[in-house]
Amino acid sequence: MSMVDLLHFRDVYPTDLSTGYKRAVAIARALAAQPECILYDEPTTMVDPIMSDILIHLMLKLKHDLRLTAVVVTHDLDLMRRVADRVVFLYEGRAIYFGPVKDLEKCDHPHIREFLAMDRVEMVPGV
């Protein structure tokens, strides 16, 4: 619990925790088994931006402090860029790219180009 900075929640019932903190508790439970690898499945989906940032910082801390290999399943380009060194990009159940995150921009697969272009969509205020 201390490794994931949750000691102040030790007397709180799980039903009283937010979705984000429930995810942090799930990470703490997984770490109790001292794994060599951890799977994060859409770790920041459906949480507010502050909790998302807390979870991302936690993932980066564990990566650094424990040298823990992580597999992150996500559709969130920002999350991928912040936490991943390498990426496997799947399309129709097949890997169409495997390599450094920084080189993903150079990939010419149309589905990857489309995915990356979605990150550049400008939001119109009030719409």
Can you describe what each PLM-predicted range is?
Residues 38-41:
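Catalytic Walker B motif of ABC-type/P-loop ATPase nucleotide-binding domains
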Residues 13-17, 21:
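Conserved ABC ATPase signature
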Residues 34:
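Conserved catalytic motifs of ABC-family nucleotide-binding domains
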Residues 1-9:
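Conserved ABC ATPase "signature" region
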